[in-house]
């Protein structure tokens, strides 16, 4: 079982229950899934970029990504409906907790000029979205073997009803918010 899941059950959940005065243990907010998305506009001209991005996203997440396709044609971008334009992974369970642990303790501290993540990136429904400009902050990526530095979006979906509960949950789990 993931280390962070144990910490959540034994320490974080009781603190949240005490702070927000929940009547039922099912009301306590928890992580439900983490979505990693890599949108690649360059994949229109060169499909090989998409293959390397999918391989790297698979190394970061520990599971095979699904290729995302264009929903509609956009002539200005020379994009046709159904063309592959990115890849994504949805993490749940132990893999989700292990990824979150790695993100907070290993990857984010490796970001250049890192002073914490914005606490304003919550969406009002308890979900947090984080944009990363360089995927090389993850320890699985070998800097010598990559052809191009790519960015990604990380969406952390929680069962929290509002931003305050989600912010408290993520802060207790170790998310380094700006002061």
Swiss-Prot record:
InterPro entries tied to this protein: Ribosomal_uL5 (IPR002132), Ribosomal_uL5_bac-type (IPR020930), Ribosomal_uL5_C (IPR031309), Ribosomal_uL5_CS (IPR020929), Ribosomal_uL5_dom_sf (IPR022803), Ribosomal_uL5_N (IPR031310)
GO MF terms, alphabetically ordered: rRNA binding; structural constituent of ribosome; tRNA binding
One GO biological process term: translation
Keywords: Ribonucleoprotein, Ribosomal protein, RNA-binding, rRNA-binding, tRNA-binding
Top-rank lineage group of the source organism: Bacteria
One cellular component term from this protein's GO annotations in UniProt: ribonucleoprotein complex
Pfam families the record matches: Ribosomal_L5, Ribosomal_L5_C
PROSITE patterns noted in UniProt: RIBOSOMAL_L5 (PS00358)
Assembly behavior: Part of the 50S ribosomal subunit; part of the 5S rRNA/L5/L18/L25 subcomplex. Contacts the 5S rRNA and the P site tRNA. Forms a bridge to the 30S subunit in the 70S ribosome.
Known role: This is one of the proteins that bind and probably mediate the attachment of the 5S RNA into the large ribosomal subunit, where it forms part of the central protuberance. In the 70S ribosome it contacts protein S13 of the 30S subunit (bridge B1b), connecting the 2 subunits; this bridge is implicated in subunit movement. Contacts the P site tRNA; the 5S rRNA and some of its associated proteins might help stabilize positioning of ribosome-bound tRNAs.
NCBIfam families hit by this protein: PRK00010.1 (NF000585)
Family membership: Belongs to the universal ribosomal protein uL5 family.
Protein's UniProt name: Large ribosomal subunit protein uL5
Originating species: Syntrophobacter fumaroxidans (strain DSM 10017 / MPOB)
């Amino acid at each position: 079982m993931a280390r962070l899941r144990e910490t959540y059950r034994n320490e974080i959940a009781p603190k949240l229950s005490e702070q927000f005065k929940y009547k039922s243990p099912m009301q306590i907010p928890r992580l439900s899934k983490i979505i990693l998305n890599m949108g690649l506009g360059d994949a229109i001209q060169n499909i090989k970029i998409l293959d390397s991005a999918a391989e790297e996203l698979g190394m970061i997440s520990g599971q095979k990504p699904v290729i995302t396709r264009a929903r509609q044609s956009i002539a200005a971008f020379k994009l046709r409906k159904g063309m592959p334009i990115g890849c994504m992974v949805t993490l749940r369970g132990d893999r989700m907790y292990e990824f979150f642990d790695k993100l907070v303790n290993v990857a984010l501290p490796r970001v250049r000029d890192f002073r914490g993540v914005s606490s304003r990136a919550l969406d009002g429904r308890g979900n947090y979205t984080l944009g990363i400009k360089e995927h090389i902050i993850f320890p699985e990526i070998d800097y010598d073997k990559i052809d191009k530095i790519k960015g990604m979006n990380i969406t952390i979906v929680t069962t929290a009803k509002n931003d305050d509960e989600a912010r408290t949950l993520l802060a207790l789990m170790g998310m380094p918010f700006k002061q």
